[in-house]
Regions:
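N-terminal polyanion-binding entry modules of DNA glycosylases/AP lyases
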Residues: 1-28, 34
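Nucleotidyltransferase catalytic core that binds NTPs
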Residues: 25-153
Length: 153
């Protein structure tokens, strides 16, 4: 999908207004792991401003290399480490993620950080995910080099 296709899809999605009133942990895989079978969920958070082929390729490679069943993309709501920087509105970044992953059956998107409001901290999101999914779901946190550089902060 080209950047122009993504922009056009975002425009269409904004025009249609998805109507979500509550945060969705997952949009496609909300019942993931509820059957009791062992499974692996990759978690890929980021600003995604914009999401691009590099993000998608890294996620797919991690899925293959780690034997992950699905990857959950989580666009940040109010990223504390990007204060003072200009970033696209969260609703636009969420729509871009939805458009970018739409054709991959192993990818899903979550709006939990955006819906939560306030400052966005990864630990809060991971706690929410751990509480949502049953113990048979192994969580794998995937991070880019830019995120790893801020871990000590």
């Amino acid at each position: 999908m080209s950047a122009i296709d993504v922009i056009e899809t975002v425009r269409k999605m904004r025009a249609q207004e998805t109507g979500y009133k509550e945060p969705h942990i997952c949009e496609r895989f909300d019942d993931f792991g509820k059957d009791g079978k062992p499974c692996r969920l990759g978690i890929m958070g980021g600003t995604f401003d914009p999401i691009h082929n590099g993000h998608l390729a890294c996620a797919e490679q991690a899925r293959e290399d780690l034997g992950l069943d699905v990857i959950l993309f989580i666009p940040t709501g109010n990223p504390v480490f990007k204060r003072g920087q200009r970033i696209a509105p969260a609703s636009d970044r969420l729509a871009m993620c939805r458009a970018a992953i739409a054709d991959n059956p192993y990818f899903d998107v979550s709006d939990i950080e955006i819906a939560r409001g306030g400052d966005t901290y990864t630990i809060d999101t991971l706690r929410t995910l751990r509480g949502h999914f049953p113990p048979n779901v192994e969580l794998y946190f995937l991070a880019g080099a830019d995120a790893i550089a801020t871990v000590s902060k």
